[in-house]
């Protein structure tokens, strides 16, 4: 099983790749590659969140299922994800089996917004965990002070 860090790293790579191929839009290959990799980036972020909330993510590419699992765990997801989750899932499967996809620039832009919001949410979660650990360390070290 991949770790939270692994999912974050892989999501960032997918996002970087989709941004890079945007330079070649409207080339069909560039569009399909970007759609596939933005889906992969969001999928991996959702899986990282599921791990952060203490569960193992399901082995699926279905964004709707992964988002539902996150919500069941109490994760507040970007509202715009509801608008594009089916499209993202379709983009992932279409890239593998269908040479032509229905591309929506508006939905692609929304997917990038979702990526950015999830990235911020994951970073905030990890930073709060670091602060909690620092507070625990401080509390424990206070108990080790010599008394006179």
Language-model-derived ranges and their functions:
Residues 1-148:
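Terminal alpha-helical segments
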């Amino acid at each position: 099983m991949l770790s939270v860090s692994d999912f974050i790293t892989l999501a960032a790579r997918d996002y970087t790749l989709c941004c890079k191929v945007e330079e070649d839009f409207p080339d069909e290959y560039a569009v399909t590659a970007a759609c596939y990799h933005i889906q992969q980036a969001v999928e991996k972020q959702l899986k990282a969140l599921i791990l952060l909330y203490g569960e193992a993510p399901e082995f699926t590419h279905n964004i709707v299922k992964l988002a539902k699992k996150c919500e069941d765990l109490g994760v507040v997801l970007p509202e715009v994800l509801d608008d594009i989750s089916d499209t993202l899932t379709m983009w992932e499967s279409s890239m593998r089996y269908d040479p032509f996809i229905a591309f929506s620039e508006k939905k692609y832009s929304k997917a990038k917004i979702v990526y950015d919001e999830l990235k911020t949410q994951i970073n905030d979660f990890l930073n709060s965990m670091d602060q909690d650990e620092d507070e625990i360390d401080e509390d424990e070290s206070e108990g080790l002070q010599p008394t006179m």
